[in-house]
A protein has these predicted regions:
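C-terminal catalytic lobe of FAD-dependent flavoproteins
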Residues: 375-457, 462, 466-488, 571-624
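Conserved N-terminal/central alpha/beta ligand/cofactor-binding core
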Residues: 58-67, 183-213, 217, 363-420
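Extreme N-terminal leader/targeting segments of oxidoreductases
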Residues: 1-130, 207, 251, 269-287
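Rossmann-like dinucleotide-binding core of oxidoreductases
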Residues: 122-129, 134-150, 154-164, 169, ...
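Central helical "cap/lid" subdomain
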Residues: 272-283, 460-510
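C-terminal, flexible cofactor-proximal segment of oxidoreductases
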Residues: 1-18, 24-27, 32, 50, ...
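Feature captures the FAD/FMN-dependent oxidoreductase FAD-binding
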Residues: 56-101, 197-265, 454
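Catalytic cores of eukaryotic secretory-pathway lumenal/extracellular enzymes that build
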Residues: 169-216, 229-239, 256-293, 338, ...
Length: 624
């Protein structure tokens, strides 16, 4: 590999210097070099320079130029030094400016995956007649297909839409983008060094999953426009009887194992507003954005101010004649100036060409965003200072986020409308680069802290006054508590929906005592609101599922279901932990909760806990 000194020098100007410092161990084979370099401070989410002073960055850059050029003058890329696990741990400590707990080292090493050669799936030829049905071709479904193929298990995918992508296919509204840094929001084994933005927009994310879909030949096993409608487990044949509709034709078949990859956020939720059917203008949910222009020069209403509205409003405000937002409660926002920033070409070059740079950069994004926040999300029962915070640390964050918002507000009438009255992190935390509040200051934009009372043929009635609109957008979220809807699933003891309603019971959010030979990805209680990315959780889940299937095949077992007592123990611990956390606070109402105010969608666990549980399949937890 030939790297010019000039190219490297230019690229290093855009580098993360804690990462570059750690790379010097690879290039020199000397762990002690870290003792001679300026030390980064403790890493925080989104800060990739370790708060190093400019002079310290220059010191690291100068040494890096010397050592990297020396290495490539005398060695080949595949001769680079692979540190021992002990040395890798020291490198981790250096990069994040603190001692990485020994509890986390196996998980971080697993994700880091330092090896001389990039990941190549080792697909095994199928040796059994088992065929697994995967429902859904979104992020989790694609992942499940890749991992099943790796262990030699046949599969097919039924996807209700006419294309793949799930969330990133359906949510094509203006401004749609991920709110987890892209170099971590990706499969751990399938890096993309060419992301154009740090938090990519929907089209680029969809392209990423399409590339994975075709790279791993998943298209050969996928049936689009196929909606599973009913599933019933037959105890006699020990198989699922599955009904589906494919291109309008009904189909019935028998399947040994089913993996649901439908997720939680796929059924649009439109509020039941009196007179909804009378409105004569354009009206749609944010995830069903039309292909015609319903915005330009129009009077537009956006109902909701959560994650989707937060992205839509700044994107359409300048094109609308008038834009009115109906807000039930304001969101908390995490200051993030990088939210809309592009990844410059020099950063892309480092990620693509400097060995292990991308792996360590991913680690630097991962670790500060893993479990450090979780302790501050537990309610301190002695905390009496304020009702809009739950403990001292949470209150400090409330002050920080409030100050960041106040600095952006020149119209004082907005203050009461945009500062939440519930604790930070009680609802989904949004990424703030100033675009939301800037849009609210535009002369054609109005924020109303009022709910829609009813609708008329011309628009909306609120506070007894009719407001006329050409277009109404419902940014009102999804039916997250209706797990597996609209599929009617009966594991032999009755309909899953009728048994559990909106209070499902599961083990790890993956298996269910009432549903044999059935697994879920992004199932109940596995949404992440404090750490990581949903892809991390999905990788945990499919590793567990594959371990279970391999155990069944190697022991010639046809049926497995989690023991009811194991499920109950897990669910009791899940519920008890949530009782102490911010998401079940008395001032919080969100899609994390069911109709009784009980959290059912979101994980209360540390990532390391969940990784350990899913990394160790225990057959004693199951009946076969």
């Amino acid at each position: 590999m030939n790297i010019s000194k000039q190219t490297l020098e230019r690229a290093l100007d855009s580098a993360s210097f804690p990462v570059v410092a750690a790379l010097l161990v690879h290039f020199t084979g000397d762990i002690s070099i870290l003792d001679k370099l300026p030390k980064p401070n403790q890493a925080i989410l989104g800060e990739t320079q370790g708060f190093l002073a400019d002079k310290d960055k220059e010191i690291i850059k100068e040494i890096a130029l010397k050592e990297i050029n020396r290495f490539f003058s005398n060695s080949k890329a595949d001769e680079i030094y692979i540190p021992s696990n002990t040395e890798l741990n020291k490198m981790m400590n250096f990069i994040v400016g603190e001692e990485v707990s020994t509890d986390y080292i196996p998980m971080m090493l697993n994700d880091l995956n330092i090896a001389t050669h990039p990941f190549k799936p080792n697909f095994i030829k199928a040796t059994s007649n088992l065929e697994v049905l995967i429902i859904g071709a979104g992020m989790s479904g694609i992942l499940a297909a890749i991992k099943l193929a790796e262990i030699g298990v046949q599969y097919k995918i039924y996807e209700k839409n006419n294309d793949l992508g799930g969330t990133w296919y359906e949510n094509q509204y203006p401004g749609s983008r991920v709110d987890i840094a892209n170099h971590f929001y990706s499969y751990s084994f399938e890096e993309n060094h060419q992301w154009t933005e740090h938090f990519s927009r929907q089209p680029e994310l969809l392209d990423y999953f399409k590339n994975c879909f075709h790279k791993y030949d998943i298209h050969k096993h996928t049936y689009f426009e196929t909606q599973v409608t009913d599933m019933k487990f037959d105890e006699l044949t020990q198989e699922w009887s599955v009904d589906s509709i494919c291109h309008g034709r009904e189909n019935k078949e028998r399947i040994g194992i089913v993996i649901s990859c439908v997720g939680q956020l796929n059924q649009p939720k439109i509020p039941q507003i009196k007179g909804l059917e009378h409105f004569q203008g354009d009206m749609f949910h944010s995830s069903q954005w039309p292909h015609f222009d319903a915005i330009s020069g129009k009077k537009v209403a956006v109902v909701g101010s959560g994650a989707s509205a937060f992205q839509i409003v700044p994107s359409i405000a300048k094109f609308s004649k008038e834009l009115t937002i109906f807000q039930r409660s304001p969101p908390w926002m995490f200051p993030n100036p990088q939210y809309h920033e592009e990844v410059d070409d020099r950063k892309k070059w480092l990620l693509e060409n400097l060995p292990f740079y991308s792996r360590w950069y991913r680690f630097l994004l991962f670790y500060p965003g893993s479990d450090q926040l979780l302790d501050s999300l537990f309610i301190d029962p002695t905390w009496k200072a304020r009702s809009d915070s739950i403990n001292e640390a949470n209150d400090a964050m409330r002050e920080l986020f409030t100050s960041a918002m106040l600095e952006q507000i020149s119209d004082q009438s907005l203050v009461e409308k945009v500062i939440p009255d519930y604790p930070p992190f009680g609802k989904r935390m949004l990424q703030d680069n100033g675009a939301w509040l800037e849009a609210l200051h535009l002369p054609n934009v109005t924020l109303l802290s009022k709910e829609v009372e009813c609708m008329s043929s011309k628009g909306v009635v609120s506070s007894g006054k009719e407001l006329e609109f050409d277009t109404i957008i419902f940014a009102t979220g999804f039916k997250a508590q209706n797990f597996f809807y609209p599929i009617n699933i009966d594991g032999g003891s009755g309909s899953f929906e009728k048994i559990y309603r909106d209070s499902p019971s599961s083990y790890l959010g993956i298996t269910f005592s009432s549903l044999p030979n059935f697994f879920a990805m992004y199932g109940p209680g596995t949404n992440l609101a404090h750490a990581g990315s949903i892809i991390f959780n999905s990788e945990c889940q499919i590793n567990y599922i594959c371990s279970a299937i391999k155990y069944m095949l190697s022991n010639d077992l046809k049926v497995m279901r989690v023991k009811p007592e194991i499920e109950k123990q897990y669910q009791d611990r899940f519920d008890m932990r949530h009782e102490k956390m911010v998401w079940q606070h008395s001032k919080v109402s969100s899609w994390y909760q069911n109709s009784k105010g009980k959290v059912v969608t979101t994980s209360p666990w540390r990532l390391i806990e969940y990784w350990n549980w899913t990394n160790n399949f225990n057959q004693d937890d199951y009946e076969f």
